[in-house]
Amino acid sequence: MQFACSLLIDQLVQHLNAFKPDIIATYPSMAVELASQAVLGRLRITPSDLLLGGETLGHESRLAIQNAFTCQIHNQYGASEFLPMAWECAFEHLHANTDWLILEPVDSNYRLVKDGEVPFTTLITNLANYVQPVYRYDIGDQIIFNPEPCKCGSSFPRIEVIGRKDDVIRILDKKGGYVTLLPLTLSTIIEQSGIYDFQIHHHSPNKLTIKLVKKQSNSSSQIQKCISQFKNYLGSMGLAHVHLEIEMVSNLNGGRSGKAKRIFHEEKNGKINSTS
């Protein structure tokens, strides 16, 4: 059974309560919202497994989902060009399926970067598709290869998906250089305050706006914690001069696919740049 991502949350909860699924496959952001509905007592289902993908699953989001649903959580990474590219092991590490594909983390000149380095983007070669070969295709994601062996014993390489290269924020510091802020780091900082519905808007050159959804679960103490932690992080990166605003909104505009678009870049003409 499939349910449209455009459904209102109340409608989705009603459908799920009636259907009582054993397995749910969805985006991490939607799983967090369903977890919130379960904690409130509105969603009354007991799935055995949650299959998550399409977005980066942060540690705080995972905890929120686990606290609401006492079931197995399976994280995966994939794209339209190859699904799935990586599966999660019992130690919550993603392992790339390198017997079926080649992943190349590269710099802006499309040269391979070292293991452990954040690449500019990643190229994919699909070894399984004989109908429409995909060779060194730029998927636009930043993937870090971890050279350390995994406790699970898998020989497949460990990877960490940072996010889209378009989601990286680069801010001018006081010395005239640029400081790079990774989307996964920024999301983790906000989620640590217990807030999961948000967007970060980058206004060049030194202004950021965090948009939060008006809801009862977002208490004033959580919002203040979010602001404090975010400012502390900016200060630690030498960006204490950055102007940070908080904007409360009734809802957030998602991407065309239903994924939770987190980072928006506002161009000088006021147009919002979003790729999801």
Model-inferred region functions:
Residues M1-S276:
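Active-site glycine/GP-rich loop and adjacent strand/helix microenvironment
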